[in-house]
Amino acid sequence: MGTAAVPIVLTFLLVFFAWRMVFSMNGDLVRARAWGVLVRKALPFIVLTLMALSMLVVRNFQEQGVLTAWAVIFVAGILLANLLSTPAAERRATKAFRRGDYESAIAEYRTLAEERPLARYHAFLGAALGANGESEESIEASNRALEEDPQYGLAYYNRALVHRRENRRSRAAKDLQRAIDADLPRRFKNAARKLLEETE
């Protein structure tokens, strides 16, 4: 294998791991068979895959203009795909949640959960309700998420935080263990393990 093949191999490895990440971060969508939402979430990676495949053709062109146009088209494509990959209401809700405007986040997540009853939207609603101090409503939203997808670990994690805050240590410990055993991103699993040690 010559040195010219190294960038191509590295690019295809990047694409492979990017697709793995898409499916690991969106396992709930696969379990819910929400293929349209999954494709939408995968848009940046679809563009990245097209970019990698087109590299095989474009690298044969020596003209600088072709390479520049190719790069500009795909940078614009990735930016546009990234923008389109998340519904506007979800972006607004996430921004509101991060800045501590929980009322706005609750309203947006509630609308999302009503329009498309996915476990993630109910869990996000539960997190916003919990952050806003609405404990029972938060638990109800987390329960609804778990009805949609019993493997959605974030719902267990959110519910555990509410139980912990309400000093229901036994329930919190059970939900933290369930969160660890379920489909949960690594950073939340680590946080759940740490909280479980503190709770027991």
Residue ranges and their predicted role:
Residues 121-122, 155, 188-189:
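TPR alpha-solenoid repeat register
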Residues 124, 158, 192-195:
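Canonical tetratricopeptide repeat
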